[in-house]
């Protein structure tokens, strides 16, 4: 068999005879630019929704303006001054506070309970009261509660965007207290505490029910207080104030799904 030999130059030389067999290329003029190498998805595609990363317009200080949509108006503060021949009471409550308590009623145990209201409700509570405590604590206890209820009423305003309802069960050692409330504008108190002693320190334990009845009357809330367990008078009363504070906090906080509307099918929550 005879081997064919070719030089390197011959191997690299193009085969003119095979190129001649190809048809000549035809150039087609087009006014459109060539298509892009990569497919660009339409921003309206249902498979890949477009996401805007544009910054908000600058504010007065040159930084992007930040806006927050809150269904609850700012500065929900209620302030009341109540003066009679028996007592002189001033109350200021900030529903959107930080749990700051500053109370001086002349009744040490009541001051301690108002501390629970502020701390567990995260309300800022300022109370000043003087009264005829040389007789007993009844008038001061009552008028402080009346003023707190009125301050709550003022702070809530039209009650737009709030949860309206609150429910909490608080334990304190052997005591267990359940509180459920509705900022309905209809005053009612359901109360079944069984406090075993007549006094805690110098405080008459009968005044606990009278405190909440007075608060309900002026605030216009529906309030139910139930004792599920408990033997120690101090524990029962303190757990009651803690549960009340937590339930009131729930009821006054914002419901973002409500969008600032009044939480009632009637469209109004009125004290009257």
UniProtKB/Swiss-Prot annotation:
GO terms for molecular function: imidazoleglycerol-phosphate dehydratase activity; metal ion binding. Weakly inhibited by inorganic phosphate (Pi). Competitive inhibition by 2-hydroxy-3-(1,2,4-triazol-1-yl) (e.g. C348), a potential herbicide. Mn(2+) 1 binds at residues 112, 139, 234, 238. GO terms for biological process: L-histidine biosynthetic process. It holds the Pfam family IGPD. Signal peptide: none annotated. It is found in: Plastid, Chloroplast. It catalyses: D-erythro-1-(imidazol-4-yl)glycerol 3-phosphate = 3-(imidazol-4-yl)-2-oxopropyl phosphate + H2O. This is Imidazoleglycerol-phosphate dehydratase 2, chloroplastic. The gene is HISN5B. Its EC number is 4.2.1.19. Residues 24-65, 252-272 are annotated as: Disordered. Substrate binds at residues 86, 112-120, 138-142, 164, 186, 234-242, 264-266. Belongs to the imidazoleglycerol-phosphate dehydratase family. The keyword Chloroplast applies. GO terms for cellular component: chloroplast. InterPro entries: IGPD_sf, ImidazoleglycerolP_deHydtase, ImidazoleglycerP_deHydtase_CS, Ribosomal_Su5_D2-typ_SF. Residues 41-53 have a biased composition (Polar residues). Mn(2+) 2 binds at residues 138, 142, 210, 235. Keywords: Amino-acid biosynthesis, Chloroplast, Histidine biosynthesis, Lyase, Manganese, Metal-binding, Plastid, Transit peptide. Binds 2 manganese ions per subunit. Substrate binding triggers a switch in the coordination state of the Mn(2+) active site between six- and five-coordinate species; this switch is critical to prime the active site for catalysis, by facilitating the formation of a high-energy imidazolate intermediate. Pathway: Amino-acid biosynthesis; L-histidine biosynthesis; L-histidine from 5-phospho-alpha-D-ribose 1-diphosphate: step 6/9. Residues 1-52 form a transit peptide.
């Amino acid at each position: 068999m005879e081997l064919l030999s070719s030089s390197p130059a011959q191997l690299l030389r193009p085969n003119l005879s095979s190129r001649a067999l190809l048809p000549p290329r035809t150039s087609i003029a087009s006014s459109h630019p060539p298509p892009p190498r990569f497919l660009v998805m339409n921003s309206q595609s249902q498979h890949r929704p477009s996401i805007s990363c544009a910054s908000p317009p600058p504010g007065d200080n040159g930084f992007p303006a930040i806006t927050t949509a809150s269904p609850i108006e700012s500065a929900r503060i209620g302030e009341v001054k109540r003066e009679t021949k028996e007592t002189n009471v001033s109350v200021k409550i900030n529903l959107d506070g930080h749990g700051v308590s500053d109370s001086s009623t002349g009744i040490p145990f009541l001051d301690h309970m108002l501390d629970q209201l502020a701390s567990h409700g995260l309300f800022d509570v300022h109370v000043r009261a003087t009264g005829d405590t040389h007789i007993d604590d009844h008038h001061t206890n009552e008028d402080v509660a009346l003023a707190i209820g009125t301050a709550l009423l003022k702070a809530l305003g039209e009650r737009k965007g709030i949860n309206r309802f609150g429910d909490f069960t608080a334990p304190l050692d052997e005591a267990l207290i359940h509180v459920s409330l509705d900022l309905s504008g209809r005053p009612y108190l359901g109360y079944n505490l069984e406090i075993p002693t007549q006094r805690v320190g110098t405080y008459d334990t009968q005044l606990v029910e009278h405190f909440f009845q007075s608060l309900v009357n002026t605030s216009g809330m529906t309030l139910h207080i139930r004792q599920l367990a408990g033997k120690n008078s101090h524990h029962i009363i303190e757990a009651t104030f803690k549960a009340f504070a937590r339930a009131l906090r729930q009821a006054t906080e914002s419901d973002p799904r409500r969008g600032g509307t009044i939480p009632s099918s009637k469209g109004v929550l009125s004290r009257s």
